[in-house]
């Protein structure tokens, strides 16, 4: 997917006031806003909008069932076909990885320490948002590899390990501490 393809896909969006695509998104991504910014070729700002609700845009853009969620709710689907929101989302996420755009970070560090059990999509997202809010976060993962079902259950042709690992690296760079091969009740109590 190149920039010209994305601009063409984004141009189909009418940036509806009622935002049915956002309502259809379980994460409540501000879809019309990140697509509006993509149309203006302001991809870094579009990434900032996405990062308010997801730290896994490269991943979700590839594997979410968009046709049942945001795209399935798209107001344009009955006229010109739904806007390909997933493709736009993962393009923006990939641009963030390629250009080294960082996730938002808190300027204020808190004293509290929080443990997150499991480095799957929920655990990593929770850890990232806690860290973004200044908490000291340690993630305990049973296995050697991070990502949970994303790593162990999604085939490589749907989600390549390089994209997944680069996305996880962005989360770790927030200051999240990771401890692998730690099983609750076995290695740690």
What are these regions (language model features)?
Residues 1-113:
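Ferredoxin-type iron-sulfur electron-transfer modules and their immediate structural context
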Residues 28-40, 48-51, 78, 82-86, ...:
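Beta1-alpha1 glycine-rich phosphate/pyrophosphate-binding loop at the start
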Residues 187-189:
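Short acidic active-site motifs
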């Amino acid at each position: 997917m190149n920039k010209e393809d994305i601009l063409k896909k984004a141009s189909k969006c009418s940036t509806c006031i009622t935002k049915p695509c956002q309502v259809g998104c379980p994460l409540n991504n501000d879809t019309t806003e990140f697509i509006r910014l993509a149309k203006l070729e302001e991809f870094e700002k579009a990434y900032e909008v996405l990062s308010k609700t997801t730290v896994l845009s490269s991943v979700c853009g590839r594997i979410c069932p968009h046709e049942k969620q945001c795209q399935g709710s798209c107001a344009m689907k009955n006229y010109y076909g739904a806007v390909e929101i997933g493709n736009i989302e993962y393009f923006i996420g990939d641009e963030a990885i390629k250009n080294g755009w960082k996730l938002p970070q808190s300027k204020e560090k808190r004293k509290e320490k929080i443990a997150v059990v499991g480095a799957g999509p929920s655990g990593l997202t929770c850890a990232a948002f806690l860290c973004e809010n200044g908490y000291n976060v340690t993630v305990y993962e049973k296995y050697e590899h991070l990502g949970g079902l994303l790593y162990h259950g999604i085939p490589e042709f749907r989600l390549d390990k390089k994209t997944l690992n680069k996305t996880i690296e962005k989360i770790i760079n927030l200051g999240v501490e990771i401890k692998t091969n730690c099983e609750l009740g076995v290695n740690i109590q």
